[in-house]
UniProtKB/Swiss-Prot annotation:
Domain Guanylate cyclase intervals: 959-1089
Gene from which the chain derives: gcy-11
A Pfam cross-reference name: Guanylate_cyc
Designated name of the protein: Receptor-type guanylate cyclase gcy-11
Protein's organism: Caenorhabditis elegans
GO biological process: cGMP biosynthetic process; intracellular signal transduction; receptor guanylyl cyclase signaling pathway
Subcellular location field: Cell membrane
Length: 1168
């Protein structure tokens, strides 16, 4: 064993005297260790054990175990015996035999051995032979194991075998079923045993060992070289196609560094597919491995001398974890740990010498087990184990008695199965065989904050997993989120590829491609896709050019048949729609307009046949001649390809189509949207230039808005707004056209389904040099367009789109104002256009916004935002649509959708109509029942509904409330009848709300008199007296804050009387039946009110008796009074009550009277 091992042995022996003793066998003096003058860690172990005995509460301040005569003695073999400082093998046994023989001569019995590190097997057997227990602190042999059983041994420390079994379970849990084990430790008896234990543990978990190598690396480490590198590379070459997970066992950590360096040299650490898990061949190893020595020494981080940079180390650790039982070092684990350090490290006290006989020597840097020095830090767990063992022993003796020390097997069995969380934070539990099962930890690198600079020590590591023992050989594994670690891809690799290293695990024909093959295939696929894309683009471009050259959009005039419109009462050059309605019946079924019905849906086939015949007859003559086309002023109705269309004239003498014009027309031909009017083509024959658009049978939006006989409800207006906005949004955002350019209500065509379709959009290049429009046509244009009208074709699409937003505002203004684009403005169009061009004194000319201020929110504000002078400040069409969303709140679909839904409902969903009517009938029935229940009790109402007679009913005990408003007559004389009614309505509404919180039934109100009762029609035992009393107090409180609306200075005062007694109830009359109470109780209750005083509650003696039974009420006896019948009675004043007492009554009677449950619910909700 290395020289750092703890030299400590305690023997627990009863001394032959008046009281038994426990002899503490171990070093407590410092000045003889290695012929120096400072304390070493094994001295701290003794102190820690003694403090554990103290803290466990099992010994007294003088060192005697509680409730016994067993005391603690101390024996230091280096001072009091012949123990050799060299501590060769056999020294522990020799000293122990000497003590045992001496005890035998003194006729003392051995109780136990504590703190053995060497010769564990032999000492445990010797202790068992002497019928003594052995409590082992730092023994690497597992004495309780089957190969060296001892029924009197309890082992505190962890062992290599335990660590290997824990690691095997961890590997199994993450699916590492194939491993390579590389053991750098050269052969020795203990090393061979540990190696075999590792292999056995892995085999027990059914983990295949694809490669195992023990020693034989012939490696030496100097300041400049690692001579075993070639043998390491040979191992990797032999194994990397067998496994991806390497388990490295080593005694010199830098060996692992060079192993990973070799893997990196071979390119195995670049993708995260290979992984290394390292373990030390000795226990208490984390400090040695992680390099807590402040000078780094020859730890794994000391790599610069071996030619490995910090940057390389950072890369290595991305495929690395370390498995250990020792917690990660930190200077302050907890306040408890810091306190423990100071306590064990404190000055000696001669009162407790031994064992606290020497102070800590000063000025010695490397003798501190609490320091960063890895050599001494490794002793900290031993010190803590000694403390925990002393505490457990003391606690056990405290609970089970000191006599347990005399029965070694019982002592061990009692302590087995117990667990402890140490001061360092790790968990230890004892198995049933007495061997500790220690918590194990898997450490991993942190995510690097930077890729440069030295690796921080020791903060580089972070906890990846904790294995918490259960005392039965199993563990609960708690993983940290792997994505927060510094390992590759934030995940652990598999021990084998999915298809195996040679594709042996995949079916024939399926195999894993190499990275080079994947790259080549990917490049080829990308190249093919690019080539296909280029070819497709070229083909599309050629087709596009051919399409433009073919002028496919040109329509010959002979294919368009003008329709004679004179017989429909309209001139050819007039409004497009004036004649549309008259010809609709001959050429198109336009849906429900004016007084039309819906029967065209049922006989559409017959009508369509008639229309086709009529159209064929009208087209038999020769094609319209040139003169007819020249007579067209603006537009004309025509037929093209058996479809009604409108031909609109372009006022030019000739039109030479340029490439830009063809591109513009091509866009018009290919744009389709439900809110765009279809463009059929262009007629370009000398001076006859016309565009062809689809015909709108329901007139334009302008014509609908100017038709005073046509009433447009909210649904129509909102639908029109949505259609215009959606069409404009498509032009701005979904079309290559990018703008409308001529938005006005006359260019908003209405189709057969009342859907708006934008027409006459685009074509700015075609309209170049066209004469300026008339002033009336310019009222929709934005001011910047009017000022630059002659060159507006040179404006960008963005500028024209911003101008569309202004035009949209005018159209919205028209829809809700219905008085034209500028409302009822008295100026004529020429003046308006002039002011738009040149604002007078900077004042802007806009339509009168007050005309649409009553329009639904937020139309007016949106209109104002859209027609601002600065185009850049106008919202986009997307923003406009978002702002107008509240306009359609509560409406579903558009006009056509609603019409079709209406038809479907009446034609196909008659059952829904019946169901709706049935539900309405049921709702009406419920309302009638509710009204009836407000007039009569539920039982009475049910009898009346069922046509049954309502018999009078006797109640032996109820409580009745009467109240009257003092001074009501005087107040009424100063008020109008309406004011009196309003006042009483407000007052009694308040009263009704209050008594609803109590188990009371309102009987009636007569003028200013208010009457209710409790105890009927729902019986509630004696609770009715309390319910009426509580409600009376609540009403009295409420009247104090009641305000008479027409006389705020007047305060109403109540006079209240309560009485308890029997009554008879019944329904009186047939017409307007009333639920009435009869009997002396009613009369006396009224007398209690009339003989009372303002703002007080007078109760009878009968009511008082039940009030006392209820409990929780404050009453005051009043002098006897004489009632109207000359009867002298004792009465009481009711002053206050306890709400909690009432709740307790209700809860106590809830089971017997279920109707009280809703009152409890209201009470708990705060409705008191």
């Amino acid at each position: 064993m290395p020289c750092r091992e703890i030299f400590l042995l305690w023997i627990l022996v009863p001394i032959a005297s008046s009281s038994d003793h426990i002899t503490f066998f171990g070093r407590y003096a410092c000045n003889v260790d290695f012929k120096t003058d400072y304390c070493t860690p094994d001295t701290y172990v003794g102190r820690a054990f003694y403090y554990g005995l103290e803290d466990g509460g099992g010994i007294t301040t003088n060192g005697t175990f509680v409730n016994s005569d067993i005391t603690v003695e101390f024996f230091d073999p280096t001072v009091q015996g012949n123990f050799s400082i060299g501590r060769q093998d056999g020294n522990y046994m020799s000293s122990m035999l000497d003590i045992m023989l001496a005890d035998t001569k003194k006729n003392d019995g051995l109780l136990g051995v504590v703190g053995v590190e060497n010769d564990c097997k032999e000492i445990a057997a010797l202790a068992q032979a002497y019928d003594a227990s052995s409590l082992l602190v730092n023994c690497e042999d597992q004495v309780g194991e089957s190969q060296m059983p001892s029924s009197t041994a309890l082992q505190m420390s962890s062992t290599q075998g335990g660590k290997y079994r824990a690691f095997a379970k961890l590997a199994k849990s993450v699916g590492w079923n194939n491993l390579a084990v590389i053991n750098f430790v050269e052969d020795g008896p203990a090393d061979i045993s540990y190696h075999d234990q590792l292999l056995d543990a892995l085999s027990a978990e059914s983990i295949s060992l694809d490669f195992v190598k023990k020693g034989g690396f012939s490696s030496t480490i100097t300041s400049a070289m690692f001579t075993g590198l070639e043998s390491v590379i040979d191992v990797i070459l032999e194994t990397y196609m067998k496994t991806r997970i390497y388990v490295i066992v080593l005694d010199l950590p830098v060996s692992g560094t060079f192993f990973m360096n070799a893997m990196s040299t071979m390119g195995l650490l670049e993708t995260g597919k290979y992984f290394v898990v390292m373990m030390s061949s000795i226990e208490s190893d984390a400090a040695n491995y992680f390099g807590f020595n402040v000078n780094r020494g020859n730890m794994i981080f000391k790599t610069i001398d071996y030619g490995i940079s910090d940057a390389d180390i950072r890369q290595y650790y991305r495929s690395f974890m370390y498995f250990t039982d020792v917690p990660h070092y930190t200077k302050d684990f907890s306040d408890e740990w810091t306190s423990f350090q100071k306590r064990v490290d404190g000055d000696a006290s001669k009162t407790f010498c031994p064992p606290m006989c020497n102070t800590k020597a000063k000025g010695i840097a490397n003798n501190d087990p609490w320091s960063d020095d890895a050599y001494w830090y490794s002793e900290s767990p031993s010190i803590v184990d000694a403390y925990d063992l002393g505490r457990l022993l003391s606690e056990t003796v405290k609970v089970h008695g000191a006599s347990l020390l005399r029965d070694p097997e019982s002592l061990v069995q009692t302590m087995s199965g117990r667990g402890v969380t140490s001061l360092l934070g790790y968990v230890t539990k004892f198995n049933t065989n007495g061997v500790s099962q220690r918590e194990y930890i898997l450490w991993a690198p942190q995510q690097a904050s930077s890729s440069n600079g030295p690796i921080p020590l020791p903060e580089w590591a972070t906890l990846a997993a904790r294995m918490l023992p259960d005392g039965k050989g199993n563990y609960s594994i708690i993983w940290k989120n792997l994505t927060q670690l510094g390992i590759f891809n934030g995940e652990l690799p598999q021990s084998k590829p999915e298809c195996g290293f040679n594709n042996e695990l995949c079916p024939a024909g399926i195999r894993n491609l190499s990275e080079l093959e994947i790259i080549v295939i990917a490049v080829c696929v990308v190249a093919i896709l690019i080539l296909v894309g280029v070819i497709a683009y070229i083909a599309r471009w050629i087709a596009y050019e051919r399409r433009l050259e073919s002028s496919y959009f040109l329509v010959h005039r002979k294919h368009v048949q003008l329709v004679d419109m004179t017989k429909f009462g309209s001139s050819r050059g007039g409004s497009m729609i004036q004649s549309a309605m008259s010809m609709r019946s001959q050429y198109e079924d336009s849906g429900p307009v004016g007084g039309a019905t819906m029967n065209f849906y049922t006989n559409g086939i017959r009508k369509a046949a008639i229309r086709r015949n009529q159209m064929q007859r009208s087209d038999k003559g020769p094609a319209a001649n040139r003169d007819e086309w020249l007579e067209i002023v603006d537009w004309h109705l025509a037929k093209y390809e058996n479809t009604l269309v409108t031909v609109r004239k372009i006022n030019k003498t000739q039109l030479k189509l340029t490439r830009e014009m063809k591109q513009e027309i091509d866009l018009l031909m290919n744009e389709t949207h439900e809110n765009l009017n279809r463009f059929f083509g262009l007629i370009n024959e000398s001076d006859l230039i016309f565009t062809i658009h689809s015909y709108g049978p329901r007139k334009s939006l302008m014509d609908l808005l100017r038709n005073d006989d046509l009433r447009l409800d909210r649904m129509f207006k909102v639908s029109f707004v949505e259609d215009v906005v959606k069409g404009l949004q498509f032009l701005h955002e979904g079309s290559k056209i990018g703008y409308h350019g001529n938005l006005k209500s006359s260019n908003c065509i209405v189709d057969a389904y009342w859907r708006i379709k934008l027409s006459n959009y685009g074509m700015e290049q075609i309209r170049v040099e066209e004469p300026e429009s008339k002033p009336d046509d310019l009222l929709w244009f934005a001011p910047e367009i009017i000022r630059r009208y002659a060159v507006k074709h040179d404006l960008s699409k963005l500028e024209l789109a911003k101008a569309d937003i202004y035009s949209l505002a005018i159209v919205l203004y028209e829809i809700y104002g219905r008085q034209g684009p500028f409302g009822d403005d008295l100026l004529d169009s020429d003046e308006i256009i002039e002011q738009l061009k040149f604002p007078d004194g900077g004042a802007l000319t806009r339509p009168d916004i007050h005309l649409i201020t009553k329009a639904p929110y937020p139309l007016a504000s949106v209109v104002e935002k859209c027609w601002v002078e600065d185009p850049a400040s106008r919202p986009s069409i997307k923003k406009v649509r978002e702002l107008l969303k509240p306009l359609s709140k509560g409406l579903k679909g558009n006009i056509a959708d609603n019409i079709m839904n209406l038809l479907d409902r009446y034609r196909n969903n008659l059952e829904d109509v019946i169901k709706e009517r049935t539900e309405q009938l049921e709702d009406e029935r419920k309302r009638n029942e509710s009204l009836l229940l407000q007039l009569l009790p539920k039982s009475v109402a049910n009898s009346l509904k069922n046509g049954q007679p309502v018999d009078a009913e006797f109640y032996d005990s109820v409580s009745i409330y009467f109240s009257d408003i003092v001074g009501f007559t005087a107040l009424s004389s100063k008020s109008t009848p309406l004011q009196v009614v309003n006042m009483l309505n407000n007052l009694y509404t308040n009263f009704d709300t209050i008594i609803d919180k109590f188990d009371c039934y309102k009987v009636e109100t007569i003028g200013d008199a208010y009457m209710f009762v409790s105890g009927l029609p729902e019986v509630n035992s004696y609770l009715h007296a309390g319910e009426v009393a509580s409600a009376s107090l609540e009403l009295l409180d409420s009247i104090k804050t009641f305000t008479v609306s027409h006389c705020p200075d007047e305060k109403l005062r109540l006079r209240i009387g309560n009485h308890t007694g029997p009554v008879v109830t019944g329904v009186v009359g047939i017409r307007m039946p009333r639920y009435c109470l009869f009997g002396d109780t009613v009369i006396i209750a009224n007398m209690m009110e009339s003989s009372g005083e303002p703002m007080r509650i007078q109760i009878s003696s009968d009511a008082y008796e039940l009030i006392l039974k209820c409990g929780g009420y404050v009453t005051e006896q009043r002098e006897k009074i004489v009632l109207k019948n000359k009867l002298e009675v004792m009465t009481y004043w009711m002053n206050d009550y306890s709400k909690d007492a009432r709740l307790a009554r209700l809860v106590a009677h809830q089971e017997k009277f279920p109707h009280l449950e809703h009152l409890i619910h209201k009470f708990n909700k705060g409705v008191r």
